[in-house]
Amino acid sequence: DFAGRSLSKYPIISMYKPFRNDLINWFVGRSRSKKTDNASVFPRDNFPFKNVLQALKKPNVFFYVGDEDLGYENSEFADFFFQQQSTLVAIRKIVEITNCSVVPVLNLFDSKSSKYITYIDKPLSDFPSDSITCDARLINSSFEKLINIEKTEYMWSLRFFQTRPRNVDYPYKKL
């Protein structure tokens, strides 16, 4: 959310996965899209994806958070810090359709300055390739590169390794 907020002064389009609680959705939606922003932020379930694709054919920026584990569907397993991670491949499909650039962005807390800093890397080159697995690995390695700037401040609370390759143990304690 902090990276999206820091980029919201620019004309960007973004989507988010709604929470189960309507009140939380209201607060989060309000904080993600203030009246002074140029950002347009939509809940995934109420915004047709074709609108994103049409918007990307114009000079627009689509802020897409790809470091989520949404299960087996639309994912490919690739290494992420030496663990097989279910990596979203939707960004690959978006690039194939729109020919847009993919620019890795990550927001990290800088313990020295006590501020959040948005790191923007150079666009991925040769993306997409002929291999979904290679593309998933490229996406993950771009995240690794940015996370390595300040590893301890990355949002490790996300359950990245929730979806496991078949016959691989679940890494978290079952509560």
State what each model feature region is.
Residues 1-45, 69-79, 83:
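Catalytic core of membrane glycerolipid acyltransferases/transacylases, capturing the structured
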Residues 9, 46-175:
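Non-catalytic C-terminal accessory region of glycerolipid acyltransferases
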